[in-house]
Amino acid sequence: MKVLWAALVVTLLAGCGADVEPGPEVQLGKEWATWQASQPWEQALGRFWNYLRWVQTLSEQVQEQLLSSQVTEELTALMDDTMKEVKACQSELEEQLGPVTEETKARVSKELQAAQARLGADMEEVRSRLAQYRGELQAMVGQSTEELRGRLSAHLRKMRKRLLRDAEDLQRRLAVYQAGIWEGAERSVNTLREHLGPLAEQAATVHTLVSKPLQERAEAWAQRLRGRLEKAGFPVGDRLDEVREQVQEVRAKVEEQANQVRLQAEAFQGRLKSWFEPLVQDMQQKWAELVEKVQLAVGAVPTSVPSEKQ
């Protein structure tokens, strides 16, 4: 687990330091196709991305809607939805951090807020640029707007690259911290099992620890009593039989109590097993899904992100 944790951190740092270089439009499209939108915030961001791709076509329909406020209003709604889901995901993760130091919580919160702010700034810049284009377009009614469309298209390509980079940076950070939480939870369950194991073993040996010494002491006492009674001239046969029966009754009661203790301990262990095994299995399944998702996300983002061409 520790080795995988270290590998995820190294991957996160390497992805954050990647440079952005030009490249063909089709490559960026393929990269976005590998986006693992399993979380609500990832799905919301996917809707923002798809709408932005449609706007970038600058078709006649897009041009008509850009002259009104419809495009910017739609982007605003998609952006607000995305940031709302991002904040909810961050809050949930911070709650799951559990018994870590306040310093660690503060550092994680600061890093996630910074990544979240970068993503929000990217979407805000897209919206602002389209609002600016709308004003320029309205001022050029009846004139050629080809140059204006070219500048907007180039700017949107640049913003799509930045948006993809910052989105995957946030995704990797969330994955790394979530992996640490699952590792800690699984380790805690294993520790609890290690502590409960000896309890079951002790309960299983209660019968031997209690009944055997009692039996030995009872037999020794009976022998001493027989010797004393014989020396005193008393008949000991019936009396010893009575004593033996009493000893057997005491022994049976002790054995019954020991068995009850053992059964209670076994039942307690069974309840704990039924409580924690589904949790461990669920965490192991989520861990496997997380590792696969991180590997796909990291493998889909090369050290240099190509630019786009219409």
UniProtKB/Swiss-Prot annotation:
- Give the start-end ranges of region LDL and other lipoprotein receptors binding: 155-165
sequence repeat positions: 77-98, 99-120, 121-142, 143-164, 165-186, 187-208, 209-226, 227-248
Q: Where is this region: Specificity for association with VLDL?
A: 271-283
Keywords, A to Z, come to: Chylomicron, Endosome, Extracellular matrix, Glycoprotein, HDL, Heparin-binding, Lipid transport, Lipid-binding, Oxidation, Phosphoprotein, Repeat, Secreted, Signal, Transport, VLDL
| Cell compartments where the protein resides | Secreted; Secreted, Extracellular space; Secreted, Extracellular space, Extracellular matrix; Extracellular vesicle
Q: Where are the annotated segments for 8 X 22 AA approximate tandem repeats?
A: 77-248
Q: Name one GO biological process term.
A: phospholipid efflux
GO terms of molecular function: cholesterol transfer activity; heparin binding; phosphatidylcholine-sterol O-acyltransferase activator activity; phospholipid binding
Chief localisation class: secreted
Q: Which Pfam families match?
A: Apolipoprotein
- Tell whether Phosphoprotein is among the UniProt keywords: yes
After translation, the protein is modified as follows: APOE exists as multiple glycosylated and sialylated glycoforms within cells and in plasma. The extent of glycosylation and sialylation are tissue and context specific. Glycated in plasma VLDL.
Residues that, per the record, bind heparin: 159-162, 222-229
Domain of life here? Eukaryota
Location of the region described as Lipid-binding and lipoprotein association in the Swiss-Prot/TrEMBL record: 207-283
Q: Which InterPro entries match?
A: ApoA_E, Apolipoprotein_A1/A4/E
Q: Where is this region: Homooligomerization?
A: 259-310
Q: Which GO terms describe its cellular component?
A: chylomicron; extracellular exosome; high-density lipoprotein particle; low-density lipoprotein particle; multivesicular body, internal vesicle; very-low-density lipoprotein particle
Q: Which residues form the signal peptide?
A: 1-18
Q: Give the UniProt family note.
A: Belongs to the apolipoprotein A1/A4/E family.
Q: Share what the entry says about its subunit structure, partners included.
A: Homotetramer. May interact with ABCA1; functionally associated with ABCA1 in the biogenesis of HDLs. May interact with APP/A4 amyloid-beta peptide; the interaction is extremely stable in vitro but its physiological significance is unclear. May interact with MAPT. May interact with MAP2. In the cerebrospinal fluid, interacts with secreted SORL1. Interacts with PMEL; this allows the loading of PMEL luminal fragment on ILVs to induce fibril nucleation.
Q: Please give the function described in this protein's UniProt entry.
A: APOE is an apolipoprotein, a protein associating with lipid particles, that mainly functions in lipoprotein-mediated lipid transport between organs via the plasma and interstitial fluids. APOE is a core component of plasma lipoproteins and is involved in their production, conversion and clearance. Apolipoproteins are amphipathic molecules that interact both with lipids of the lipoprotein particle core and the aqueous environment of the plasma.
- Name of this chain's protein: Apolipoprotein E
Q: Which organism is it from?
A: Ceratotherium simum cottoni (Northern white rhinoceros)
